[in-house]
Amino acid sequence: VGMGAVEAALRDKPVIITEYGAPCAKIMIVGEGPGRDEDMEGRPFVGRAGQLLDRMFAAIGLSRSSDDADASIYITNVVPWRPPQNRDPSPIEIDMMLPFLRRHIALAKPEIIVAMGNISCQALLRKRGVTKLRGQWATGCGVDVMPMFHPAYLLRNPLAKREAWQDLQAVQERIR
């Protein structure tokens, strides 16, 4: 995908949301793309799903507001804009933004990436099906990746929170 395609895709996007948290963090969280709340605030994961994400990582002693590399998380998305009608990013959009995501990862140098949902699994692992992938360590962009259910999914399917807790505990074990 050439730069002309990137420029065309970004031309009509009013808000570009890149990252939040301490770039020195050992853990990078990669979401799918901004939603309505993120579009309004200009930061990733600020709506109900973001509040759940904060509670999830607080349960293992991590926070997006900490400057301590050992206690912080760094958050970004596969695509930095809200797709029209809040749809999932298309395969073309994912492929278009993949070089930027890879470079972002290379610059941040996380020890672990948490891939939140199908779109981030597709981008990082080139696989879909977070239900099958979750709970198993994989490698993406040269970094250990833990696929997890997206917090928005957990809000719709509270019974999956038990599996998400197991995944968080695996992340906690890996960083100790």
Per-region residue spans from a language model:
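A polyanion-binding, active-site-adjacent surface
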Residues: V1-R176
